[in-house]
């Protein structure tokens, strides 16, 4: 069973290794507890839809050019792990971090943003009561944040940041937007043709 020290050693060791850029994770997804995963899985969904693959073994990276990693890093229970994760982020190849936390003391996004600076950190309040904690950063300590539970949007924002350097991601972002536009058109026509009562019945049966 791995210990916190094992994970700290892993991050520190990985930070010293020379790997091709394509073999390093571009986006890091972290959360304070595995109970946050249902909310944070939206980021996984968005990145996967945009052609990213999840890196689960640093020594055996996916074939995809763009990858992400996922970890549980608690600001309160494992502050040393959080510090090491954020401090080594740049040297491990990360360009953006998506950090989610719940409760009224949702400190993981804020602390990560402070330590990983200048790497951009996108905070995801897992619950409504976490919003004030996540966005409450003082002047000079920036963090970007989405609304409660919107980890999907956080991932889109992360890819928008990466797209400034990678034109192919611009095309992927435009494609996913066009898919959503088509969804609206399809639903609109279906509602019009079926009528409100029938449309609602069919939607309830789906």
Language model region names:
Residues 36-40, 79-81, 104-111, 131, ...:
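Short glycine/serine/threonine-rich phosphate/pyrophosphate-binding segments
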Residues 112-149, 172:
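Short, acidic/small-residue loops that bind anionic groups at enzyme active sites
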Residues 80-125:
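Glycine-rich phosphate-binding loop
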Residues 1-24, 180-206:
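Haloarchaeal acidic low-complexity proteome signature biased toward cell-envelope/secretome components but also
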Residues 150-189:
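A charged, well-structured terminal subsegment
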Residues 15-68, 72-75:
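Glycine-rich phosphate/diphosphate-binding loop of Rossmann-like nucleotide-binding domains
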Residues 33-34, 73-75, 102-103, 126-129, ...:
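Short, ordered loop/turn segments at secondary-structure junctions
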């Amino acid at each position: 069973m791995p210990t916190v020290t094992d994970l700290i050693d892993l991050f520190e060791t990985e930070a010293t290794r020379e790997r091709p850029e394509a073999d390093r994770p571009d986006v890091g997804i972290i959360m304070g507890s595995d109970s946050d995963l249902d909310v944070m899985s939206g980021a996984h969904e968005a990145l996967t839809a945009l052609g990213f693959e999840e890196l689960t073994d640093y020594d055996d990276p996916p074939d995809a050019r763009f990858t992400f990693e996922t970890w549980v890093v608690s600001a309160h229970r494992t502050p040393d792990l959080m510090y090491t994760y954020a401090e080594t982020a740049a040297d491990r190849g990360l360009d953006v971090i998506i950090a989610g936390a719940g409760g009224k003391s949702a400190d993981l996004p804020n602390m990560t943003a402070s330590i990983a600076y200048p790497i951009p950190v996108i905070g995801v309040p897992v619950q409504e009561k976490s919003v004030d904690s996540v966005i409450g950063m003082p002047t000079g300590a920036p963090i970007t944040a989405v609304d409660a539970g919107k980890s999907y949007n956080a991932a889109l924002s992360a890819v928008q940041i990466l797209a400034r350097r990678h034109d192919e991601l611009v095309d992927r972002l435009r494609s996913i937007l066009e898919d959503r536009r088509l969804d609206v058109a399809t639903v609109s026509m279906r509602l019009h043709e079926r009528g409100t009562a029938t449309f609602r019945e069919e939607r309830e049966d789906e």
